[in-house]
From Swiss-Prot:
Species classification: Eukaryota, Metazoa, Chordata, Craniata, Vertebrata
Active site: 154, 178, 249
Membrane topology: Peripheral membrane protein
Record gene name: LIPH
Pfam families (UniProt xref): Lipase
Signal sequence annotation: 1-16
Function: Hydrolyzes specifically phosphatidic acid (PA) to produce 2-acyl lysophosphatidic acid (LPA; a potent bioactive lipid mediator) and fatty acid. Does not hydrolyze other phospholipids, like phosphatidylserine (PS), phosphatidylcholine (PC) and phosphatidylethanolamine (PE) or triacylglycerol (TG).
Name of the featured protein: Lipase member H
Main localization, broad class: secreted
GO CC field: extracellular space; plasma membrane
Chemical reaction(s) catalysed: 1-hexadecanoyl-2-(9Z-octadecenoyl)-sn-glycero-3-phosphate + H2O = 2-(9Z-octadecenoyl)-sn-glycero-3-phosphate + hexadecanoate + H(+)
Length: 452
């Protein structure tokens, strides 16, 4: 009998450990991934009332959920090791800081945890059906589809799309963070995320050559660094092991997070291709002068009205990032008119220095440019720092040749203009000669009103 009571007491202790005061995302072991897991969806609610302590909610128990407020669902993807997403709590905190909302973390780790990707992929529609059942109960209590926002990561992006399809695209918004590519590439719209799944669909593609989806899936599709090989991520498996496989894929989440923290605002440029963007062909955003370019992340829907004027209401947008947070690059245009008798072909490096002595350098990442007499060449330059009062500019001209004569580039006029701050005065230099591979510093002046 004593053994029996001891056994019951131990069971009670185990039960009390399981029923946490603050429920957390399901944490599983790699063993669970090897043997596979049955689907079990838990909904963890965070609000400003309980932003550090989640509530388990379901179709009958709503906790602190207020149906009159915006409700954001965060849906994760494939979990091959069973661990919680490393970015999850940062995303929860950042979202609740920018807006008073209901934040629901969709925990389907039991189901997503498996070493066999197809098993997790096959459960995505089941997760979507469960979410629809919950949203139906929200609607019955007075919620509006306009106020439903879904953020889906990898497989979670397609789950969000499946939910949206069941409401005929009437959800307020879906954000896809590097939607999964394997098993979804080439699928018809009914089998993946699609622009018609919500009133507004924005997508960040950060790993299109491996785990992500390459083609556009939203009303606006952002391609940081062309959608491949993100700066700061390891280039080989020997540098960082498993991080090599997932770093590019996860970068979509960290870029989205940066838009919430407001350390800087990442501006993107609608363009047909990354190549055209890098060559400076897409800086007016396809809008009348003075209209803002789209912003990456949480505030991307500010561009919804501009997109509605397009037919179809879709666009691709490109931008470059720095290697680490805050990720912003500051864009300038460098307009150059030369007067060499002979054609020159090469690239330009530019360095800026402000009045305090701070410097920032940009290799103007373009294909070799042809400089012809009296023809203007416009180059897009990107810098890690934004220097307000530029006191000195340095230029280096290079043809890329290792041997042979050093050529000169004779500049009739160089003009520097900020894309991020068009109100700043444009800076010029007239009658300048660059010797190949030699840094040439000079003090710019405010451009004259009459230009060639």
């Amino acid at each position: 009998m004593l053994r029996f009571y001891l056994f019951i007491s131990l069971l009670c202790l185990v039960r009390s450990d399981t029923d946490e005061t603050c429920p957390s995302f399901t944490k599983l072991s790699f063993h669970s991934a090897v043997v596979g897991t049955e689907l079990n969806v838990r909904l963890l609610l965070y609000t400003r009332k309980n932003y550090t302590c989640a509530q388990i909610i379901n179709s009958t128990t709503f906790g602190n959920l207020n149906v009159t407020k915006k409700t954001t669902f965060v849906v994760h993807g494939f979990r091959p090791t069973g661990s919680p997403p490393v970015w999850l709590q940062d995303l929860v905190k950042a979202l609740l800081m920018v807006e008073d909302m209901n934040l629901v973390v969709v925990d389907w780790n039991r189901g997503a945890t498996t070493v066999i990707y197809t098993q997790a992929s096959n459960k995505t529609r089941k997760v979507a059906i469960i979410l629809k059942e919950f949203i139906d109960q929200m609607l019955a209590r007075g919620a509006s589809l306009d106020d439903i926002y879904m953020i889906g990561v990898s497989l979670g992006a397609h789950i969000s799309g499946f939910v949206g399809k069941m409401y005929n695209g009437q959800l307020g918004r879906i954000t896809g963070l590097d939607p999964a590519g394997p098993l979804f590439n080439g699928k018809p719209p009914q089998d993946r995320l699609d622009p018609s799944d919500a009133q507004f669909v924005d997508v960040i593609h950060s790993d299109t050559d491996a785990l992500g989806y390459k083609e556009p899936l939203g009303n606006i599709d952002f391609y940081p660094n062309g959608g491949v090989d993100q700066p700061g991520c390891p280039k080989t498996i020997f540098e960082a092991g498993m991080q090599y496989f997932k770093c590019d894929h996860q970068m979509s989440v960290y870029l989205y997070l940066s838009s919430l923290r407001k350390n800087c605002t990442i501006t993107a440029y609608p363009c047909d291709s990354y190549r055209d963007y890098r060559n400076g062909k897409c800086i007016n955003c396809g809008l009348p002068q003075g209209k803002p370019c789209p912003l990456l992340g949480y505030y991307a829907d500010n561009w919804k009205d501009y997109l509605s004027e397009k037919d179809p209401p879709m666009t691709k947008a490109f931008f470059d990032t720095a290697e680490k947070e805050p990720y912003c690059m500051y864009h300038y245009f460098v307009d150059i008119i030369t007067w060499n008798k002979s054609i020159r072909r090469g690239s330009i490096t530019i360095k800026l220095k402000d009045e305090a002595g701070n410097t920032t350098e940009s290799k103007i990442n373009h294909e070799p440019v042809t400089f012809e007499k009296y023809h203007q060449v416009s180059l897009l330059a990107r810098f890690n720092q934004d220097l307000d009062k530029v006191a000195e500019i340095s230029l280096v001209f290079s043809t890329g040749a290792v041997i042979g004569p050093k050529y000169k580039l004779r500049i009739l006029r160089m003009k520097l203009r900020s894309l991020a701050h068009p109100e700043r005065p444009q800076l010029c230099r007239y009658d300048l000669v660059l010797t190949e591979n030699v840094e040439t510093p000079f003090q710019p002046i405010v451009c004259q009103k009459l230009q060639m």
